[in-house]
């Protein structure tokens, strides 16, 4: 069972990595396509410089997030049902939550604290003097802690879908 859980988490984390790389492609605005990972002081500077609009992250970010969630929930449901053997809400919810928090902490520790805090690729021209904000690990860790509750909300539909699949197939 542990091997299956690890494999499910690995598959889902790889999907998430693909989504991150997709969101920083040049057609999506490069690193500006991930403004939600930047500390507020950097976002404020970018707004002041006119690099990003005053209105927020923009419709592209919201669309990409919605697509990722709409792909992730059925994918996790299939992983839990067909691969993990879940047939009830609770077991599917727990497996889905485990996949979500594995993906979350991978993103926080590897992409946030590792790549974002140390790669010059993420430094936006005009914000170079904000090095302390770029190296703020705590900002990413706080986001991970807060994100754990949001992941529980995202795991619930997986539990419902798996429960529905079990009823339909049984």
Q: Would you name each region that the model predicts?
A:
Residues 1-98, 102-170:
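Juxtamembrane/disordered regions of integral membrane proteins
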């Amino acid at each position: 069972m542990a091997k299956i859980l690890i494999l499910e988490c690995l598959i889902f984390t790889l999907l998430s990595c693909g989504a991150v790389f997709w969101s920083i492609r040049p057609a999506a605005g490069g690193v500006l396509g991930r403004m939600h990972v930047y500390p507020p002081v950097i976002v404020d500077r970018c707004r002041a410089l006119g690099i990003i609009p005053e209105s927020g992250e923009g419709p592209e970010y919201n669309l990409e997030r919605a697509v990722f969630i709409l792909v992730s929930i059925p994918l996790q449901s299939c992983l839990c049902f067909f691969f993990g053997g879940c047939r009830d809400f609770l077991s599917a919810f727990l497996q889905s939550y485990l996949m979500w928090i594995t993906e979350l902490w991978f993103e926080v520790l590897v992409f946030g604290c590792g790549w974002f805090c140390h790669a010059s690729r993420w430094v936006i021209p005009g914000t170079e003097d904000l090095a302390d904000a770029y190296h703020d690990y705590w900002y990413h860790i706080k986001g991970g802690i807060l994100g754990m509750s949001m992941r529980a909300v995202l795991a619930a539909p997986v539990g419902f879908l798996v429960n529905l699949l079990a009823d339909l197939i049984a």
